[in-house]
């Protein structure tokens, strides 16, 4: 009996079929593990891609390059650089979070259009209450598609970082016929004294009486120099009890922008270069995709560009009272003519 058992054991050890089965089983296990790893990686990559940027979701393609309007063909001026500026209604450090939504709202929005071919700069002021398509996300960053609401919320629905910035860029691009808007500068309320100081303080003419009760010296038509104590109110204050009070704030922002650009044009290039280096002190309050080299190139263009108060344009349209908030509705025909005038040339 014992001898028989030993023969069976020897036969089992030398049986190639058993070895083959073991090898096959191991290969199957490895294949399953590999498949699972690949599947998990793909799902994670898909998830991340949905969370990275609105710019990845919205591809402008080439459709904007050539358009036809009222029978006339137009070609996009490829020597234009577009930079979006937005001031958001928050204080403290600007930083992204893993949870999307409920972020700051873009209170002031402007597109800087630098036309190197015609040596001019235009600033297109965009009402924050403009009703247009913006991108929404779930709380964990999944893309929910486009939704029509106030353009200022394009930043709010993102992550408070790059996604928010690029969502706002996308909203402006969609509003303006898919023109490319890739560069941006976003600041919050705590940045204002630093921005003012970069230009050595700004002196301007007050355009309205909105602030006269708090600042008697700020009567319409008065010349004032803004300092740390007044800059935030001048650029941000509005009477929330009054309908369309954002219009008065936009008038003050326009006056400030005009004076600021004129001051920068009067500075020499060395001082403007130092201004970039000084931005380090406001790192916590600024988000930008503009590199140092791009900034220096823009500075040179700025020095040569034609710029007056008339170089600041406002989005054409009308104010309306909405169910919850004021709304600004664009005049589509006037907007199309503005787009052609700013960005296109006849073929």
Predicted regions and their residues:
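Non-catalytic, solvent-exposed segments at the cell envelope interface
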Residues: 2-28, 35-347
């Amino acid at each position: 009996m014992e001898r028989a058992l030993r023969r069976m054991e020897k036969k089992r050890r030398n049986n190639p079929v058993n070895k083959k089965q073991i090898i096959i089983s191991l290969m199957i296990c490895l294949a399953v593990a590999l498949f699972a790893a690949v599947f998990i990686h793909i799902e994670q990559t898909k998830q991340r891609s949905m969370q990275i940027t609105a710019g990845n979701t919205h591809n402008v393609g080439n459709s904007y390059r050539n358009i036809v309007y009222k029978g006339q063909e137009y070609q996009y001026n490829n020597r234009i650089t577009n930079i979006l500026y937005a001031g958001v209604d928050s204080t403290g450090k600007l930083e992204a979070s893993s949870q999307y939504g409920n972020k700051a709202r873009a209170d002031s929005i402007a597109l800087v259009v630098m036309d190197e071919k015609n040596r001019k700069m235009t600033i297109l002021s965009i009402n924050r209450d403009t009703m247009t398509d913006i991108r929404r996300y779930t709380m964990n960053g999944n893309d929910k598609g486009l939704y029509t609401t106030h353009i200022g919320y394009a930043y709010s629905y993102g992550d408070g970082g790059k996604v928010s910035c690029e969502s706002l860029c996308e909203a402006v691009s969609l509003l303006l016929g898919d023109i490319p808007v890739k560069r941006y500068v976003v600041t919050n309320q705590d940045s204002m004294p630093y921005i003012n100081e970069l230009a050595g303080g700004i002196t301007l003419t007050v355009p309205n009486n909105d602030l006269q009760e708090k600042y008697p010296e700020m009567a319409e038509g008065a010349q004032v120099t803004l300092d740390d104590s007044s800059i935030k109110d001048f650029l941000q204050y509005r009477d929330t009890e009054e309908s369309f009070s954002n219009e008065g704030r936009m008038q003050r922002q326009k006056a400030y922008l005009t004076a600021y650009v004129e001051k920068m044009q009067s500075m020499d290039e060395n001082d403007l270069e130092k201004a970039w280096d000084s931005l380090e002190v406001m790192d916590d309050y600024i988000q930008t995709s503009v590199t140092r080299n791009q900034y220096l190139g823009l500075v040179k263009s700025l020095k040569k560009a034609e710029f007056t108060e008339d170089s600041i344009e406002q989005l054409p349209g009308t104010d309306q009272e909405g169910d919850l908030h004021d709304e600004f509705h664009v005049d589509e025909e006037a907007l199309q003519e503005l787009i052609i005038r700013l960005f296109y040339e006849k073929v």
